[in-house]
């Protein structure tokens, strides 16, 4: 029993962070306070504010505290601890990915490309966009409007004639001399920049002026090209929502909550344009107040993400926040400029907020229906296997091409569906090419030879294959020397049936020593097919990446003494890989950073390749 009175006697009145632990020494809640003693004392009053707090207090075994120099510092530390410990009584944002940007590079002939990560390359960044699909859509649109290159520099610097993009009018071919002047190309780059900044009218005014000038000069062919470009830009603008207000960069957030599930809808607006929206489904403890949920989400969303998750000038929410000023101060410090959180808005901002609310409710309804279907399928599988409960399932598959670049995948499902953060791939090495049995054995060893936490032990492991694959898996588990309960998982083989068609799968249950043929309409079969297909796709995508990497390797990677900088120098000065292969020993030695001895090694290696 936790002695609250004894603990509180030594707690300071300073600002800080506290961590609450259960009897298994697991952090179950992280909080922060302007006055630690006052805040922690509130947990041990007779009349607690909610059932959630009652359940939390009943689980406390011990508490530790950490003093901070300010409440703002405590707020930042709180979010860092939440990310680290993932406590079950905190609201948890289950998305920590960076967001993609569009990058306009700073070069003689700039290119437009998608980019994700820290902003380390010279150029202008536009975004963030809610997902990669929104970036691809925008890049495709830009290609149709402005013939600016999107190719990699390795392609651009080694062209002797224009590529297909020039032939279909989506690039002006700056890579080949004589097709477009630097001035003409940079004009199109500037138009693309203005368009990405939301300055559509400036783009139209410029193009109209150029069209009229071409007409006056009797250059009707050029005037027609400008006319077509004007029509294309106008067509795009007409499809966009046009605000009468001058809108700042902002994110708009709305929350919908029903049956224990919450959806946070975020709309991204930059330079007055809606870049897109995205739905988030944070893990919410029972009886959590929606204002607390909003507050926690805002903090985690901007303070726990990667550098790609930029902070806008203003954040609009549909709930009153108790710690609004503290959040604003912290976000301002993080962004290096003033950031405001608005709880009451008018005009177009209000329309956007209403739109976010509608989308949040719609996304929540879809998620509730999917969760209901997933729950039904889980129950059907439990009934089929005579199991009281299934919390976690894992499935393995193998992918290769003629025995080369073999990759194994492991996908994970919990009661809510795919748990993509726990997906893994394994590079399979040291086996006979095409030996799927050995590949599966190696994948299982890599996955399960290490220590597993209690909640990471799967209840079911699906093996994509028949009895042979399943027997190899059983052999691996028989010889495992681990601390966790290796007998807990049920190993199940999923054979494809006689005709290898969907719906004819045969389940081979190792512990029950039986085979099950399921009807096409079986909910349990649908769940198994979902898991198996997910594993198959994950394995194939990993194999393709590995195969593409092997295909694009220059051969220089394997030469000792040739790192990334020297490789780039060789390719740059000798005109690509073919230029390096055709170069003489003296030509290789003339490249900056390449000694005569290293040049001899490179020359001999490529000659014998």
UniProtKB/Swiss-Prot annotation:
Subcellular location: Cytoplasm
Residues covered by the UVR domain: 201-236
GIY-YIG domain segment(s): 13-91
GO process terms (BP): nucleotide-excision repair; SOS response
Main subcellular location of this protein, as a coarse class: cytoplasm
InterPro entries assigned: GIY-YIG_endonuc, GIY-YIG_endonuc_sf, GIY-YIG_UvrC_Cho, Hlx-hairpin-Hlx_DNA-bd_motif, RuvA_2-like, UVR_dom, UVR_dom_sf, UvrABC_protein_C
GO MF annotations, alphabetized: DNA binding; excinuclease ABC activity
Keywords: Cytoplasm, DNA damage, DNA excision, DNA repair, Excision nuclease, SOS response
Domain of life: Bacteria
One of the record's GO cellular component terms: excinuclease repair complex
Pfam families: GIY-YIG, HHH_5, UVR, UvrC_RNaseH, UvrC_RNaseH_dom
Quaternary structure annotation from Swiss-Prot or TrEMBL: Interacts with UvrB in an incision complex.
Role according to the record: The UvrABC repair system catalyzes the recognition and processing of DNA lesions. UvrC both incises the 5' and 3' sides of the lesion. The N-terminal half is responsible for the 3' incision and the C-terminal half is responsible for the 5' incision.
Family: Belongs to the UvrC family.
Protein name stated in the entry: UvrABC system protein C
């Amino acid at each position: 029993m936790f002695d609250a009175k004894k603990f509180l006697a030594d707690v300071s009145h300073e600002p800080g962070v506290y961590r609450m632990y259960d009897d298994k020494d697991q952090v179950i809640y992280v909080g922060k306070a302007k006055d630690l003693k006052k805040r922690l004392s509130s947990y041990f009053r007779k009349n607690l504010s909610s059932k959630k707090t009652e359940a939390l207090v009943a689980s406390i075994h011990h508490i530790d505290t950490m003093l901070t120099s300010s409440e703002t510092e405590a707020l930042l530390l709180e979010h860092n601890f939440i990310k680290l410990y993932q406590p079950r009584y905190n609201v948890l944002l289950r998305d920590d990915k960076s967001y993609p940007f569009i990058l306009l590079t700073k070069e003689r002939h700039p290119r437009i490309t998608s980019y994700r990560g820290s902003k380390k390359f010279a150029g202008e960044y536009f975004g963030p966009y809610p997902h990669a699909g929104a970036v691809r859509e925008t890049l495709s649109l830009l290609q149709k409007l402005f013939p600016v290159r999107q190719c990699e520099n390795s392609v651009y610097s080694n062209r002797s004639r224009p590529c297909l993009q020039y032939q279909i009018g989506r690039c002006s071919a700056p890579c080949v001399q004589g097709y477009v002047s630097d001035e003409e190309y940079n004009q199109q780059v500037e138009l693309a920049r203005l368009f990405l900044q939301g300055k559509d009218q400036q783009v139209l005014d410029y193009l109209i002026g150029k069209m009229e000038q071409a007409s006056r000069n009797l250059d009707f062919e050029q005037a027609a090209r400008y006319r077509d470009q004007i029509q294309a830009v106008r067509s795009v603008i007409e499809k966009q929502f046009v605000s009468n207000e001058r809108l700042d960069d902002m994110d708009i957030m709305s929350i919908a909550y029903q049956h224990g599930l919450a959806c946070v809808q975020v709309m991204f607006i930059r330079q007055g344009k809606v870049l897109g929206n995205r739905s988030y489904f944070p893990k919410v403890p029972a009886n959590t107040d929606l204002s607390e949920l909003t507050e926690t989400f805002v903090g985690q969303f901007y303070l726990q993400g990667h550098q790609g998750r930029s902070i806008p000038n203003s954040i609009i929410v549909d709930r009153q926040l108790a710690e609004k000023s503290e959040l604003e101060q912290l976000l301002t410090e993080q962004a290096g400029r003033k950031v405001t959180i608005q709880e009451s808005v008018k005009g177009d901002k209000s329309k956007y907020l209403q739109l976010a609310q509608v989308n949040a409710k719609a996304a929540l309804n879809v998620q509730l229906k999917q969760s209901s279907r997933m729950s039904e399928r889980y129950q059907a599988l439990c009934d089929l296997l005579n199991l009281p409960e299934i919390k976690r399932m894992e499935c393995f598959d193998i992918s290769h091409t003629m025995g080369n670049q073999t990759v194994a995948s492991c996908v994970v499902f919990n009661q809510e569906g795919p748990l993509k953060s726990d997906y893994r791939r394994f590079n399979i090495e040291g086996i006979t090419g095409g030996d799927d049995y050995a590949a599966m054995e190696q994948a299982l060893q890599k996955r399960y030879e290490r220590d597993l936490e209690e909640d990471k032990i799967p209840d079911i492991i699906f093996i994509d294959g028949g009895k042979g694959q399943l027997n190899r898996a059983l052999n691996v588990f028989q010889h495992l020397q681990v601390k966790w309960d290796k007998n807990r998982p049920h190993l199940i083989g999923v054979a494809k049936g006689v005709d290898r068609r969907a719906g004819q799968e045969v389940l081979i249950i190792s512990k029950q020593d039986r085979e099950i043929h399921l009807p096409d309409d079986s909910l349990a079969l649908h769940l198994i097919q979902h898991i198996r297909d997910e594993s198959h796709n994950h394995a194939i995508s990993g194999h393709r990446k590995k195969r593409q990497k092997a295909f694009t390797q220059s051969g220089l990677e394997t030469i000792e003494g040739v790192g990334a900088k020297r490789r780039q120098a060789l390719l740059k000065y000798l005109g690509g890989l073919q230029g390096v292969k055709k170069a003489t020993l003296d030509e290789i030695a003339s490249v900056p950073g390449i000694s005569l001895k290293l040049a001899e090694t490179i020359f001999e290696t490529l000659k014998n390749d």
